[in-house]
Amino acid sequence: MRYRRDIPELFKYNAFVVISDGVNSKYGSLFAPYDYFYAWRKVHPDEAPREGVESLMSMMHGLFPRERLLDVIHNFIFFPENSKKEVKIVCRYPQYFAARKLYNNILERSRIHGEGDGKGGTYFGATGSGKSLTMLFLTRLLVRSKAFAS
């Protein structure tokens, strides 16, 4: 904590951290409580979540390929403005896959090129699944999209 107080620049470029004992692997923001660290259990959105030793490989192959890692850093980290503390929120894997799927569906069905039906679709998420953050991440993707001339 002393480094955070005395040399805050040291942590400026830290997007998130990973903790692992080889069986259980989780990621989260540097100073977040352990309860806010989550496993990345899928490489592809359509596969079954992996547990145990497989979850480490799932995190390595699902979160750290260059393109996805840069996407997460660029589009899926959020700093709430109204927080009284320094808070950094990193997406969970279901939020990442949902926002990406919604974005691709909106892009595919948009009338940008005159071919889509203009329907974006519906998103259903269970209570506590992070729907608000998923919508925030989707909005960020849409606003930053060159396809939508944003």
Per-region residue spans from a language model:
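ATP-dependent helicase/translocase motor core
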Residues: 1-150
